[in-house]
């Protein structure tokens, strides 16, 4: 309440892939009613509370988000109307016709997913072309810091490993192995420190693009909620942006930038272009309320050796609380010794 943070409060039900359908057994409903009434009376006086939900990822028999047709959810909706009528209630999250982003227009209401980088190309078309109204859970996995890896394992590793090849690694991050992803994107990494840097860069890239894409649909997309900020277990790799021992990953800083009140963004659909290819990408500046006026917007294309291959600075008038299209980033992809360039926006 004091910090002004909005709270989405779910009743204590979650599928997590097990028992997806909310129970309608009479004894369970009796216990759930008692728990829900207590929760409503305790929490309804908090000004930070904005919405109630029946629970996390609750499904029907067809694996679609549960609706008020379920007796369990209908009972909770009635209790909210009776005890906290000023607040919104949703049956579950995700809610609506689809649980995940749909390619069919108009069906992505409150959606979840995904939690891993979808690959060069698909990551950007999947998240960049959605029409979701609310993206209430998504993530991207990345390795923990070197300090956390060394502290978690009895012997500090010098080389990365696949989770499936090492029981201890698997115990600390089975779902979140990024080994093949990094090998595909960057080639083989022998050194654990380099591997961690690559893994954290990919996590940061994946999350930043999703956040910027959703914000470029301002007034059509109402929010983005990352899974997750921190974690209750010392994983070697996970979707958290702050690891178990409190070390910020690169994604922490890139997501912070993406939420900045004044933020330039580039809209693209892949990370690789052949040398000599003409590249033309939309450039937008995202603004919060209260931020408006003329601003200098600059971009540059540089090599890792510091060479500048293209650049431009322009003055643009920025409207407040808006997606300000300020032109394009247009250049011919240069031939570089290492095949890499950096596009910088300011």
Predicted regions and their residues:
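Terminal connector regions
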Residues: 285, 295, 307-309, 322-346
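An acidic-aromatic loop/edge-strand motif
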Residues: 76, 247, 345
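Short secondary-structure boundary/capping segments
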Residues: 4, 66-69, 104-108, 149-153, ...
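A generic secondary-structure signal
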Residues: 38-42, 78-79, 209-216, 332
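Active-site mouth of glycoside hydrolases
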Residues: 1-100, 224
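C-terminal cap/loop subdomain of S1 sulfatases and analogous C-terminal strand-loop tails that border
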Residues: 96-126
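Short glycine-/acidic-enriched loop or helix-start segments at secondary-structure transitions
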Residues: 63-64, 101, 145, 236
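Substrate-binding clefts and catalytic carboxylate motifs of secreted carbohydrate-active enzymes
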Residues: 52, 81, 90, 118-318
């Amino acid at each position: 309440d004091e910090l002004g943070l909005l709270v989405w409060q779910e009743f204590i039900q979650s599928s997590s892939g097990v028992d997806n359908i909310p129970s309608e057994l009479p004894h369970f409903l009796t216990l759930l009613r008692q728990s829900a009434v207590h929760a409503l009376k305790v929490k309804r006086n908090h000004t930070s509370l904005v919405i109630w939900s029946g629970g996390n990822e609750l499904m029907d028999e067809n694996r679609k988000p549960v609706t008020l047709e379920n007796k369990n959810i209908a009972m909770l909706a009635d209790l909210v109307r009776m005890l906290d009528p000023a607040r919104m209630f949703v049956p579950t999250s995700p809610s609506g016709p689809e649980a995940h982003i749909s390619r069919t227009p108009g069906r992505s209401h409150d959606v979840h997913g995904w939690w891993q980088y979808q690959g060069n190309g698909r990551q950007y078309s999947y998240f960049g072309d959605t029409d979701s109204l609310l993206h209430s859970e998504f993530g991207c996995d990345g390795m923990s810091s070197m300090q956390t890896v060394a502290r978690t394992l009895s012997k500090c590793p010098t080389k990365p490993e696949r989770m499936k090849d090492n029981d201890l690694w698997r115990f600390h991050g089975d779902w979140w192995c990024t080994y093949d992803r990094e090998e595909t994107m960057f080639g083989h990494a022998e050194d654990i420190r380099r591997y961690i840097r690559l893994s954290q860069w990919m996590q940061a890239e994946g999350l930043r693009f999703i956040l910027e894409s959703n914000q470029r649909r301002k007034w059509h997309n109402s929010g983005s909620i990352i899974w997750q900020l921190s974690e209750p277990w010392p994983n070697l790799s996970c979707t958290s942006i702050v690891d178990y021992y409190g070390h910020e990953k690169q994604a922490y800083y890139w997501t912070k930038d993406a939420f900045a009140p004044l933020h330039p963004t580039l809209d693209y659909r892949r990370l690789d272009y052949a040398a000599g290819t003409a590249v033309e990408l939309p450039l937008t500046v995202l603004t919060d309320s209260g931020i408006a006026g003329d601003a200098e917007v600059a971009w540059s294309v540089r090599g890792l050796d510091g060479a500048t291959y293209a650049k431009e600075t322009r003055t643009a008038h920025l409207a407040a609380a808006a997606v300000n299209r300020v032109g394009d980033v247009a250049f011919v992809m240069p031939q570089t010794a290492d095949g890499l360039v950096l596009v910088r926006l300011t």
